């Protein structure tokens, strides 16, 4: 069962014991309740919280909630194309900035390149736009959790690297989401430099 609306206690136990409560980014997922990507979002958030805790970062992600609010696929595609081509980003509708949370995960209904954007670029929140899972590459085993984690990495400020064995590999390198395919459930790792960057969050 998905753990929406309840923050895992483990996110807060260590900081409380050390006297420093973590900052939290509440996550709002925009998509239908039966979307298969919801489970992968939860797994990706758990992955990032493990990474953030391991480097003693003061940031955690969660809790996770879901909204039936939708964003037009045409706008999502325009944002994706603008990121890929270095063009000016079109803003999201103002109503989306009024949604609760600090990070929006938008589950698109069509196919384009998924993207992750730091807070303030298209909305008040950080935004991860995730392509449809109706077909490859997201329908391939182990891809969805890693692709979503990859885009959340961009929301956290990480950039692409060129190592195909690493989570954040991407353009202009030839890494593509299908490389995450595996019969074993696992997340691809971060580089030492990326872990150091997380420590400053």
Residue ranges and their predicted role:
Residues 1, 11-13, 41, 184-188:
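Intrinsically disordered, low-complexity proline-rich regions
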Residues 4-26:
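Bacterial Sec-dependent signal peptides at the C-terminal "C-region" and cleavage site
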Residues 21-35, 130-132:
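Acidic/histidine-rich, surface-exposed loop or edge segments in extracytoplasmic proteins
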Residues 24-26, 56-60, 165-167, 198:
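Residues at or immediately flanking beta-strands
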Residues 30-32, 106-111, 132-133, 158, ...:
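Active-site-proximal beta-strand/loop segments in catalytic clefts of secreted hydrolases
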Residues 38, 42-149:
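Metzincin-family zinc-dependent endopeptidase catalytic domain
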Residues 119-120, 124-138, 142-143, 159-201:
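Metalloprotease/metallohydrolase-associated module, dominated by Zn2+-dependent proteases
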Residues 146-160:
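Active-site recognition of the HExxH zinc-binding catalytic motif
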């Amino acid at each position: 069962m998905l753990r929406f609306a309840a923050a895992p206690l483990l996110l807060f136990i260590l900081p409380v014991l050390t006297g420093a409560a973590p900052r939290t980014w509440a996550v709002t997922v925009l998509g239908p309740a039966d979307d298969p990507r919801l489970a992968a979002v939860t797994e990706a958030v758990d992955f990032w919280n493990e990474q953030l805790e391991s480097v003693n970062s003061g940031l955690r992600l969660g809790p996770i909630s879901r909204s039936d609010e939708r964003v037009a696929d045409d706008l999502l595609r325009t944002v994706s194309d603008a990121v890929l081509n270095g063009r000016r980003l079109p803003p999201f509708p103002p109503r989306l900035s009024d949604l609760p949370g600090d990070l929006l995960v938008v589950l698109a209904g069509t196919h384009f390149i998924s993207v992750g954007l730091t807070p303030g670029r298209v909305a008040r929140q950080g935004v991860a736009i995730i392509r449809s899972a109706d077909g490859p590459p997201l329908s391939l085993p182990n891809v969805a959790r890693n692709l979503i984690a990859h885009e959340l990495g961009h929301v956290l400020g990480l950039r692409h690297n060129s190592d195909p064995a690493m989570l954040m590999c991407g353009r202009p390198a030839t890494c593509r989401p299908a490389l995450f395919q595996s019969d074993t459930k696992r997340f691809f790792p971060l580089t030492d430099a990326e872990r150091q960057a997380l420590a400053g969050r």
